[in-house]
Amino acid sequence: MAEILIHSTSSTVIPSVDPHQVTEVDLPFRIMKLLDESHPIIHKEPVHWQFGVNPDPKRMHDVMIENMVYHRGLGLSANQIGMPVKVFAMRVDDSDNAIVCFNPKIIKESDETVMMKEGCLSYPELYLNVKRPQAIEGTYQNADGDEINVHFEGLAARIFHHEMDHMEGNTFLNRVSRVFLQSARRKQKKLLRKGRQNGRTD
């Protein structure tokens, strides 16, 4: 398992829900529609979250966690569910801990990089080999507006880095070559076609 160092104790225990069984009625917060790559919000840089102006950051925190769980993601950005603000949720390890990052920033990236296959909720069945830093140092505000400093390694660094792409109006498509993307798109079409034939809807 990849080592993950977290210089923060402000994580949230993810509710124990089975995403295969949950319905909107079971969740205490409204589930938002997941936007796919065709929506312009995905490709536009979100605006900063303004504490004292934007409504109820603690409710926003909970909505982000619930939607990440419902949509079965390792991370989820607010613009992926129709809210163009710089906020994302992410799992910080392979247990039930998660954080919600308001106005996140990357301060430093390691020179060491890792190539790894990853996906994105807004691009169903598309998997790309993406090179990202092995470790990052970052900062974000929690729901109380406090600034939190973090150091992530391994998978957590990759998730934070992936979600930061969304914070700039970019996606993981911007990190691969056109030739590789064309090949991955062909595989995506086959997987989507197979899913429809098998009656899958997710």
Residue ranges and their predicted role:
Residues 1-202:
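Positively charged
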